[in-house]
Amino acid sequence: VIYHNKEELEEIYSDKEYSDLDSFFTRKQLIYKYLNHEGGEKYWFSLNLFEKTCWLHIALFLARLENHESEKVKEITLDGYYIKSELDLYCYIGEEVCGVLGYMGANFSALRDCLDGSISRPVQPPLKIVWKNFEYSKHNFVGQYCEIQDMVNFISESAVLELY
């Protein structure tokens, strides 16, 4: 995987607990599972935080290779039972908009750019996001870099967000 923007890579992958070699082999394993149809919808949910970060690396790389002529998505529905962290939210939005291993950002600024059309993604701004079972997410959210209310406020700036 070639990264053109070193700062973007460092922001996505800032866990010093793992080496670059760990990251390489984890990404390799995830790509293998994806190519062999072992990593389908919501596969990311069973991954630990490091593996989710690697999942988002792969999604970012694939997004750069995509043909952006696909139909624009106007609305997605998220189930709060699958959102327990900031990385879960990025993985889930990416999957709902772009399919398995879809990319819609891996940090606040990248998500905003994807939602508002600054980065070519298959979204019709403003994207409507319906977040079911929000209370479950709220009570189980583990914020590594932010709290769930920060995410809600941030998403509300670039999308139409409905919480249920």
Located regions from the model:
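N-terminal intrinsically disordered, low-complexity segments enriched in P/E/S/T
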Residues: 1-102, 118-164
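Short, surface-exposed helix-loop/turn micro-motifs enriched in polar/charged residues
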Residues: 103-107
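P-loop NTPase catalytic core of nucleic-acid-dependent motor ATPases
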Residues: 108, 112-118
